[in-house]
Structures are given as structure tokens and as C-alpha cells.
From Swiss-Prot:
One of its GO terms (cellular component) is perinuclear region of cytoplasm. GO terms for biological process: basement membrane organization; caveola assembly; endoplasmic reticulum organization; endothelial cell proliferation; insulin receptor signaling pathway; mitochondrion organization; negative regulation of endothelial cell proliferation; negative regulation of skeletal muscle cell proliferation. Its main location: Golgi. This is Caveolin-2. The lineage of its organism: Eukaryota, Metazoa, Chordata, Craniata, Vertebrata. It comes from Microcebus murinus (Gray mouse lemur).
């Protein structure tokens, strides 16, 4: 909420060919400017997903398969993991990003415009409710509990073994 001292990491690329002076927006090819060295998980949210072949398939020292089987299975594991991830992201990344965006926007809106005003209203009203509750307790509940306590205190039980 104060003065921002860090530079924002924002880049804007305009091509002379793709920028139209007539008001029509033509975007440049994003692959042209893709930075393959950029860290896509800077906060290490998914560091636990770095799974290698040796983390999944392991043969003890006493039982080994043939070297060619081991090499082929390792290659097949890596290729299938790579291809399936690319395939799934092509079909699922954009729809899931859209759904996640809608979900987070909805939750943010509910939190900002409904939940926090409700909480603040409750906190403003609580002193009045506390005063009323104390009065109800002093006028109704305390005398009732005192009467019931006095009534039960006059009861005595005597046990006899016959």
C-alpha cells in the first residue's frame, strides 16, 4: 500500500510489421519473443513434481534386468512423460486457466464485497449485542439458575443398605 520501490517485470514488444497505426491491433507472434531460460516456477510451488525415472522405477542390486531393457524403459518413460504432458497441456491448460481465473475472480469478489463487509458489520454490532446479552443474562438467566440451585440444594439423599 506504500511506495513501490521494485521495478516491475513487464516487457512490451512491438513489431513495425504487426503494429497497425489504423487502430486495428495485430499481435506479434509470441513464440518469437519466448524466453526459454525464464523460470516458470519462481516460488517453487511445484518442486515436489520433479520426478525422474529413478524416483519411480528402481531395481535392487540383487535383481537387475538386461541393460537394453533398462535403457529402453528409461527412454520410453521420459518420452511418454514429455509427450503426454505436452498433449494434456495443449488441451487442458487454457480451459483450466480460464476456470481458475473465474474461480479466483469470484472468490476475490465475494471476499471483498460480501464477506469483509459482513465481518466488519458484525464487529460493529457486537458491543451492542454484548450489552443486550449481559442484560438478558442478569435479568432472566441468573435468577432462574439461582432459583434452581437453591431448590436442588435443599434436597438431601439418604442411602440405606437393607
Amino acid at each position: 500500500m506504500g511506495l513501490e520501490t521494485e521495478k516491475a517485470d513487464v516487457q512490451l514488444f512491438l513489431d513495425d510489421d504487426s503494429y497497425s497505426h489504423h487502430g486495428d491491433v495485430d499481435f506479434a507472434d509470441p513464440e518469437k519473443f519466448a524466453d526459454s531460460d525464464h523460470d516458470r516456477d519462481p516460488h517453487r510451488l511445484n518442486s515436489h513434481l520433479k520426478v525422474g525415472f529413478e524416483d519411480v522405477i528402481a531395481e535392487p542390486m540383487t535383481t537387475h534386468s538386461c541393460d537394453k531393457v533398462w535403457i529402453c524403459s528409461h527412454a520410453l518413460f521420459e518420452i511418454s512423460k514429455y509427450v503426454m504432458y505436452k498433449f494434456l497441456t495443449v488441451f487442458l491448460a487454457i480451459p483450466l486457466a480460464f476456470v481458475a481465473g473465474i474461480l479466483f475472480a469470484t472468490l476475490s469478489c465475494l471476499h471483498i464485497w460480501i464477506i469483509m463487509p459482513f465481518v466488519k458489520t458484525c464487529l460493529m454490532v457486537l458491543p451492542s449485542v454484548q450489552t443486550i446479552w449481559k442484560s438478558v443474562t442478569d435479568v432472566i438467566i441468573a435468577p432462574l439458575c439461582t432459583s434452581v440451585g437453591r431448590s436442588f440444594s435443599s434436597i438431601s439423599l439418604q442411602l440405606s443398605h437393607d
